[in-house]
Design a protein with these regions (language model features):
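Conserved N-terminal catalytic/coupling substructures associated with nucleotide/phosphate chemistry
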Residues: 1-144
Length: 144
């Protein structure tokens, strides 16, 4: 993966940047859930929304990777679970974490809520029609 091109393109339907200087972002799994439910994507931790590379505090990178892997396997956080494998990237003498999230054949929930991805944001899916449409989209896509 070419980090420079991801940064140049900016956030979009399949790319999300999150600051993570001293902790894993609270809304990380909303994005994971939205990517699983839509087209998949890449999350870069240590980058601002505008694409500025800030990096992650020294000594926190391995802790964050373990936390992300553990939470992705926790049905209270992400259901059904989907084990993520964060990757550490050295970029411009700063540490980033890259989380690749593929599209999933299932509809996922984050803390009991369904999220979808649109343009460059994660949105909670609340209406019965939207939820039905998501299940139909997944069913049609994975049964062909």
């Amino acid at each position: 993966m070419d980090i420079q091109s991801v940064l140049q393109k900016g956030e979009g339907i399949s790319a999300e940047f999150k600051r993570a200087e001293s902790k894993v972002p609270d809304n990380l799994f909303e994005t994971v859930c939205a990517f699983l439910n839509r087209n998949g994507g890449i999350i870069l931790l240590g980058v601002t929304d505008s694409g500025k590379v800030e990096g992650i505090k020294a000594g926190m990178v391995e802790k964050f990777c373990k936390e992300i892997s553990n939470l992705s396997n926790n049905p209270q956080k992400l259901n059904p679970t989907f084990l993520l494998e964060p990757a550490v990237i050295d970029f411009r003498r700063k540490k980033l974490i890259s989380v690749y999230v593929p599209v999933s054949s299932q509809v996922h929930r984050c803390a009991g809520k369904i999220f979808d991805r649109s343009v460059d944001g994660d949105y909670e899916v609340r209406s019965d029609d939207q939820i039905r449409n998501m299940y139909s989209r997944k069913s049609a896509y994975y049964s062909e």
